[in-house]
C-alpha cells in the first residue's frame, strides 16, 4: 500500500506529458535507434485517460494471457500508470545484445523550486528480428526468469527468488484459508500466479524496476490484478491472504465502500491480522485523541502503516460478523454509503459515529489484550 500516491498524482499529473531525452544513447546504431523510437512511441500512448493498444507492442501470447502485459505499468500505484509519473524521461542506457536491446530510463519531475523528484528507473527489453522486421517488448519477468523458481501448490503457481527456501507450512496455511473462504462465501476456485520476494527492492527488480517511488518501505505489501489473476507481494512469503482475497472480491465488489475494509477484516494487512490492526488503531486514538472518526472516510493518517478508513470498515465488519455471520457481511456489501449503513445497522447518526467507533475499538483491544 502506498498511501501518499494520490497526493503526488494531484500535484504533478498536470505535468506528466513531457519529453523523452535520448542524448546519452548511441543513435548511430540503427538497431538501438529503432528500439528507442519504438519505446518512445509506446510511452507517448500513455495519456491522462487512455492506455496503449498493447497488441502493437507486446507479443501475441502475452496479450492473450494478460490484460496488462507490461508488469511495470502498475508498480507504483494499482490504478495509475507508472509512465504517467514525471514529465522528464531520460533514456540513459542502451545496449545491444544478440536478440534484444536493453534500455534504462530515469523518470523524474522538477518542481517550481528546481527540486528533482525521482519516480522510477526502469528496464525495458526490445526484441529485434531483422528478417521479419518484427519489433516487440520482452517482459522483464521472462528476461529475469532464470533468477526465480516456480512451484505449484493447489491452484497457486508461486514465482520466487532462487535464494528463498520455499515454506510449505505457510503455503498450506494459505491454501486452507482460501478453501474455507470459498466454501463460506460460495466462490469457485481460482487458479492464479503468486509472485513474491523478500523485499520491495527484489520485487521491483523482478518486474523490471531498479527504483520506484516507495521502494524504501520495509513493511509487507502487495498488489492484486484480478483480470490477470496475478498477485505481487513482498516481505510476507507464501501466505499473503489479503491480496488473494482481492482476486475473489474485486470483480464483484470493487466499487463497494465496504470491500477493502472487509478484506482487512478477513485477511489483515501489512503482514498482520485484524486483531493487531484493532490494537494499533486503539493506540493511535490514544496518541491522537482529537481524531474524529465520524469523518473516517476522509481522514489523513499520521502513521503510513495504518489506514484509518479500511480499519474502521474492518471493525464494522467484525461487529456485524459476530452478530449475523457471513450473511451479515454480504448485506454490508450492498450498501452504497455509510450514512445508510449506520442508520440501518446501528441506529445512529453521523455525529455519534465517533463515540461508537472509539468505544468498540477500545472494547475489542481490551479483549485482545486479556
What positions do the PLM features span?
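Extracytoplasmic/secreted envelope proteins and their assembly/folding machinery
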Residues: 36-40, 171-178, 241-245, 260-264, ...
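Soluble non-cytosolic domains of exported or imported proteins
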Residues: 29-37, 48, 164-175, 231-239, ...
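Bacterial Sec-dependent N-terminal signal peptides
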Residues: 1-23
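Hydrophobic, Leu/Ile/Phe/Ala-enriched alpha-helical segments that form helix-helix packing faces
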Residues: 42-46, 177-185, 320, 342
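N-terminal low-structure segments adjacent to metalloprotease catalytic domains
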Residues: 16-149
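Juxtacatalytic substrate-recognition/specificity segment
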Residues: 148-255
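Acidic/His/Gly-enriched intrinsically disordered linker/tail segments
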Residues: 252-370
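Short N-terminal secondary-structure initiator segments
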Residues: 79-110, 235, 239-244, 248, ...
Amino acid at each position: 500500500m502506498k498511501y501518499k500516491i494520490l497526493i503526488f498524482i494531484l500535484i504533478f499529473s498536470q505535468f506528466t506529458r513531457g519529453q523523452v531525452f535520448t542524448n546519452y544513447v548511441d543513435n548511430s546504431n540503427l538497431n538501438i535507434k529503432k528500439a528507442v523510437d519504438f519505446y518512445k512511441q509506446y510511452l507517448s500512448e500513455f495519456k491522462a485517460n487512455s492506455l496503449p493498444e498493447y497488441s502493437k507492442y507486446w507479443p501475441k501470447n502475452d496479450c492473450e494471457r494478460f490484460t496488462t502485459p507490461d508488469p511495470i505499468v502498475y508498480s507504483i500505484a494499482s490504478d495509475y500508470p507508472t509512465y504517467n509519473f514525471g514529465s522528464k524521461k531520460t533514456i540513459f542506457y542502451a545496449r545491444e545484445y544478440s536478440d534484444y536491446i536493453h534500455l534504462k530510463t530515469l523518470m523524474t519531475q522538477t518542481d517550481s523550486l528546481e527540486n528533482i523528484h525521482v519516480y522510477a528507473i526502469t528496464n525495458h527489453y526490445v526484441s529485434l528480428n531483422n528478417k521479419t522486421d518484427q519489433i516487440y517488448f520482452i517482459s522483464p519477468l521472462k528476461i529475469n526468469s532464470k533468477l526465480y523458481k516456480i512451484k505449484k501448490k493447489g491452484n497457486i503457481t508461486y514465482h520466487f527468488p532462487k535464494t528463498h527456501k520455499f515454506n510449505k507450512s505457510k503455503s498450506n496455511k494459505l491454501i486452507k484459508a482460501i478453501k474455507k473462504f470459498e466454501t463460506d462465501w460460495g466462490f469457485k476456485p481460482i487458479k492464479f500466479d503468486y509472485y513474491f520476494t523478500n523485499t520491495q527492492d527484489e520485487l521491483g527488480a523482478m518486474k523490471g524496476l531498479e527504483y520506484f517511488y516507495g521502494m524504501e518501505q520495509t513493511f509487507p505489501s502487495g498488489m492484486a490484478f484480478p483480470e490477470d489473476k496475478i498477485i505481487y507481494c513482498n516481505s510476507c512469503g507464501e501466505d499473503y491472504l489479503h491480496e488473494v482475497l482481492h482476486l475473489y472480491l474485486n470483480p464483484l465488489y470493487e466499487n463497494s465502500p465496504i470491500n477493502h475494509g472487509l478484506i482487512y477484516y478477513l485477511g489483515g494487512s501489512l503482514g498482520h491480522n485484524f486483531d493487531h490492526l484493532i490494537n494499533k488503531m486503539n493506540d493511535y486514538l490514544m496518541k491522537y485523541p482529537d481524531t474524529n472518526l465520524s469523518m473516517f472516510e476522509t481522514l489523513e493518517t499520521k502513521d503510513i502503516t495504518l489506514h484509518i478508513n479500511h480499519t474502521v470498515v474492518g471493525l464494522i465488519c467484525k461487529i456485524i460478523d459476530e452478530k449475523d455471520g457471513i450473511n451479515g457481511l454480504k448485506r454490508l456489501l450492498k450498501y452504497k454509503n455509510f450514512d445508510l449503513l449506520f442508520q440501518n445497522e446501528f441506529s445512529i447518526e453521523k455525529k455519534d459515529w465517533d463515540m461508537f467507533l472509539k468505544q468498540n475499538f477500545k472494547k475489542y483491544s481490551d479483549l485482545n489484550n486479556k
